[in-house]
Amino acid sequence: AIGHFFYLHSAMATNWLGSAHEQVTTAYAQAPSFQKMATQMGIIDFHQWASAKAIDLHSRAGQQVVELVKTKVKAEFGSEVFGMLDALSECMEKISKELKLKEAKFGLTMALPLVGMQHNTLKPPATEGPMTDAALLDEAVYWVDFAQGAYGKDDIKGYDKASVNVAIGEKPGVEVKAANLQTTGVQLPGHFVAVDRTMKAVVLGIRGTTTLSDALTDAVGEATEVEKCPGLLAHKAMLASAKAVIENTRSALEQALKETGFPLLITGHSLGAGTAILCTVLLSVVSPLSGRPRMRCFAFAPPPVVGPLTHNALRGLTIHSFINRADVVPRASLANVFHLGLECMAVDRLDLYHHRFNLMRRDAAPENEEETKAKQLILDAVQECQDERAKKHHESFPPLFVAGQVYWIEWQGQVGSVEDVKTDSSERKPRVHMAKAEAFQALLLRGGTNALKDHMCGGYKEGLEGYKAHLQAFGGCHCVIN
């Protein structure tokens, strides 16, 4: 599919040759040496032969453009990005009319690396200071294993409770009461109910998708109003998913809560995190459990699922949402994809011709004044789109947000960098910042990042554990990590 995607959009990219076909045909036809050679070769229709040669050259130029873009994108974002681009193309097809994709001259594929040039100039998300609550950090490190546990273990099939236990790891006092890991997808994700007597909690763990491309495709969906909550919008598919999980686990939850008197802890990763957030909302204000137990939610890599954040139904909920570095899923919503598409279309409309390819080929390093001007045109075009979005939202795509208190895990390289530290992995140093969901309302294409690695549950665990070790080493002082 990604090959088809590149071919479709890159076919238009060869327009940078202008009227190459016509020009080459004319050159062949007007060259006496070619005419003489054609006669010797027995070519009767010289114009047809010249035209065929022009088409061949044009085709090869198009293939070279495709390979250039693929090489550039792979170097910038890692090989996994092709699956991500495939998913993004599917997402943009959902809103092709609004984006006017048919009017694209070069295609979105050609624009993405250039849009990424501007994204690389942006500052990191605005934060509200470091996470200094050591007890809460301890809990996040602990509960991320339960989010991972919802995936189970591939080598233990047919024994869901045992699979969850092994995936969670050795944790005393944990008893899995119910588990259904065989269901997958956004309709009814895998899930389990457990009692943790050590932490004194009943746990509802919800599984996410196993691939980044699936997570992106499923995360980008329509919004719908939540019943009994006028004005509160939620991701339509994940809201249905949350209702299905509650229906399948209500009995086990009620029984475990009644037996123990413990509060309820809901957790998940990726789409499982989005579903966990919506389960928290539904069980709080729409269809509460008996006795209305105290509830908390730990969401790792959640997509935007609710809005507006000022709605009364969201007040009083205890939701902790974690975003790892440049993970795209917490930034993936229909509104955000639409605005990324607008940025691509703005770049596509620029009359840059061969400058766009030279900039891609040379890592956006202009070699002359013309290329410098071309780069600035690109930066200005994308910035203008971002400024327009800041003024108002598109009425067809209401914004959804990651709910609760947001924590951003930054892997420290240079100050404020989202790039990998170019040292041994054991020396990578994470920090965790408190932030607001509004700071993640853009689907960014950051160079030097790995979309898949940033999204994996293991990456979240590594970041949280690394920051915990740092706080312990410095006696709770967050300090600036150099």
Question: What is each model feature region?
Answer:
Residues H9-T267, L271-N482:
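Non-catalytic, mobile gating and regulatory segments of ester bond hydrolases
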Residues A1-Y7:
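Low-complexity, disordered terminal segments
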